[in-house]
Regions:
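Membrane-interface starts of transmembrane alpha-helices
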Residues: 9, 154-165
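Generic hydrophobic, amphipathic alpha-helix propensity
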Residues: 13-25, 41, 62, 66-74, ...
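Short helix-capping/turn signature of helix-turn-helix
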Residues: 56, 116-121
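Hydrophobic alpha-helical connector segments
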Residues: 65, 80-106, 165
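Amphipathic alpha-helical packing segments from all-alpha helical-bundle domains
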Residues: 72-79, 123-149, 159-163, 171, ...
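Secondary-structure edge/capping motif, primarily at the C-terminal ends of alpha-helices
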Residues: 81-85, 114-118, 176-180
Length: 220
């Protein structure tokens, strides 16, 4: 019975911590990191200040938890998007880019926290951001290596080409997050796909590129 009670207590703690994190996500999304205070989160989550500090050391600790969870979510999206990139490469490339962009588009508040609010906060966050980029690049490099070996693409340097590919995604996402026009991020999927295919000298059919994008967007 002691074990059961301990387990139930831990589950309640985990649920409360998750509720604080979920609430903080909404507050950070509305006010940004610098505009949010611990009091804002406490009031929104309907908890005491003591409860907040039981789970988190300070606002930065809470934000770091959000950042880490967001990093995992977007990394998993990238991994999922690249799974079939080498199958019918023009179709696969377009599906990969469309899927990743659609994931970001559907999670714009989280993306804003990840790509904008976390920039330049402190050396620790800059290190985390660099590690995230490195994970993205390393994972992409595995698929680019397959492309190079199969002769499907012109890849003189796998690391540099992987960095460049991730860079095109990152810069388009950053522009979209700061853009006030109503266009969706997935509107960029076609141009971004064609640009990368041409940069890697990959033969493609325009119809295949459009078909791949449509297949992904129609599933959303």
């Amino acid at each position: 019975m002691v074990y059961k009670s301990s387990k139930e207590t831990q589950e309640r703690k985990d649920l409360k911590k998750k509720r604080i994190i979920d609430t903080a996500f909404k507050v950070f999304s509305l006010k940004g990191y610098h505009g949010t205070t611990v009091k804002d989160v406490v009031v929104a989550a309907d908890i005491s200040v003591g409860t907040f500090y039981f789970y988190f050391k300070n606002k930065e600790d809470l934000f770091e938890t959000l950042y880490d969870e967001g990093s995992v979510e977007f990394y998993n999206a990238l991994c999922h998007s690249l799974v079939n990139i080498n199958n019918e490469i023009d179709l696969g490339f377009s599906k990969a880019i469309a899927f990743f962009l659609s994931t970001i588009e559907l999670n714009r508040p989280l993306a804003k926290i990840m790509f904008i609010d976390a920039v330049g906060l402190n050396p620790n966050f800059e290190r985390k951001r660099a590690e995230v980029t490195q994970r993205y690049t390393n994972y992409t490099a595995g698929y680019f290596e397959q492309m190079k070996k199969s002769g499907k693409a012109s890849i003189p340097d796998i690391k540099i080409c992987s960095l460049a590919f991730i860079g095109t995604l990152y810069n388009v996402i950053m522009d979209w997050l700061q853009d006030t026009s109503p266009h969706g991020l997935t509107d960029c999927a076609y141009t971004l796909t064609v640009y990368n295919l041409q940069a890697l000298k990959i033969d493609y059919k325009d119809s295949q590129v459009k078909e791949g994008i449509n297949q992904i967007l129609h599933k959303i």
